[in-house]
Amino acid sequence: MARVTVEDCVDKVPNRFELVMLAAHRAREISAGSELTIDRDNDKNPVVSLREIAEETQSADALRERLIESNQTQIEVDEPEEDSMAMLMGGGQPDKPAEDDMSEEKLLRALMEAQGQP
């Protein structure tokens, strides 16, 4: 890698660690078949990616967004709430338990009857 290329890039991306991440991501994109925005000039992918960043044919912001998207494992999708989902499916009212007016005494009596005790 040419030192001049790295020093040119530091003007565009001041943080060297971020520069390494962006250049590596762009080099992987090139390896995967992405089109080059500059002439290769017999350079390897990491050098080409640094030259693209230095010449601003690849925006650092666009590269940063693509890097973030490539590292995401779960993409958030807006899903309706359960109450809204029931209404959308034709239920009208969301599922709720029926009103229960059973007192403690009635509950104990029902349990005893179920067990066969008087």
Swiss-Prot record:
Catalyzed reaction equations: RNA(n) + a ribonucleoside 5'-triphosphate = RNA(n+1) + diphosphate
Alphabetical keyword list: DNA-directed RNA polymerase, Nucleotidyltransferase, Transcription, Transferase
Annotated GO CC locations: DNA-directed RNA polymerase complex
Domain of life: Bacteria
Any Pfam family hit: RNA_pol_Rpb6
SUPFAM superfamilies reported for this sequence: RPB6/omega subunit-like (SSF63562)
GO molecular-function terms, A-Z: DNA binding; DNA-directed RNA polymerase activity
Region listing for Disordered, in residue ranges: 78-104
GO biological process annotation, one example: DNA-templated transcription
EC class name: transferase
EC number per UniProt: 2.7.7.6
Family: Belongs to the RNA polymerase subunit omega family.
The protein's role, per its UniProt record: Promotes RNA polymerase assembly. Latches the N- and C-terminal regions of the beta' subunit thereby facilitating its interaction with the beta and alpha subunits.
Subunit structure: The RNAP catalytic core consists of 2 alpha, 1 beta, 1 beta' and 1 omega subunit. When a sigma factor is associated with the core the holoenzyme is formed, which can initiate transcription.
Xref: PANTHER family: DNA-DIRECTED RNA POLYMERASE SUBUNIT OMEGA
Name of the protein described by the UniProt record: DNA-directed RNA polymerase subunit omega
Source lineage: Bacteria, Pseudomonadati, Pseudomonadota, Alphaproteobacteria, Rhodobacterales
Gene: rpoZ
